[in-house]
A protein has these predicted regions:
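Extracellular/periplasmic carbohydrate-active domains that bind, remodel
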Residues: 1-182
Length: 182
């Protein structure tokens, strides 16, 4: 167990090896100005500082705050609605209070004017009126770990929240903000 406080913070063991690009999504580099259906590979946006091969993140809401628009939330919950969520009387569900955030990561295949084509299809329908933004996605690429063996002594009987060993006493490898990596 490599946790500094194994009995107080059972889930909080430090990572032994971490491969991480330390920048976040930062500020928006453009706004999506036209609707795009789910499965499309092309969006319309005037972007700065990117070109073919660059990685970007389509963001609904902000990296800090979610979008609290009823239509946005209900589209994500469909066929359900946030208004139908049962909560204690007088309270509002967290999904309405905090809103939703969507982050889609894509690699740009080509840019022609304001038309941006990705190497893969988008996974959400884009409604231009909902405030979709494009952020640059800084990352490391082609990071890999091979021919590495971790050997330990597994507990005979797992008990959820039973001890620090049950709840994350070991975190061996963490990959954060990497692309085309293994």
């Amino acid at each position: 167990n490599n946790s500094p406080k194994p009995t107080e913070e059972m889930w909080n063991a430090p990572v032994m090896m971490e491969f991480k690009h330390n920048t976040g999504l930062k500020e928006s580099i453009g706004v999506i100005t036209e609707d795009a259906p789910i499965g499309s590979r092309t969006i319309t946006a005037s972007l700065t500082g990117v070109s073919a091969g660059s990685w970007v993140c389509l963001v609904l809401g902000t990296p800090e705050l979610g979008n609290t628009n009823d239509d946005v939330i209900n589209s994500e919950l469909s066929p359900y609605r946030w208004q139908d969520i049962k909560v204690q009387q007088g309270t509002t569900p967290n999904i309405k209070t905090n809103g939703i955030q969507i982050f889609e990561y894509h690699q740009i295949e080509k840019i022609s004017g304001n038309s941006v084509t990705f190497k893969e299809p988008i996974m959400h329908a884009i409604n231009k009126d909902w405030g979709w933004n494009v952020h640059k996605f800084a990352n490391y690429a082609n990071v890999g770990v091979e021919d590495l063996t971790f050997k330990g002594h597994a507990k005979e009987k797992f008990i959820h929240h039973g001890s620090d060993i049950d709840d994350g006493g070991f975190k061996l490898i963490d990959f954060v903000r990497l692309t085309n990596s293994w």
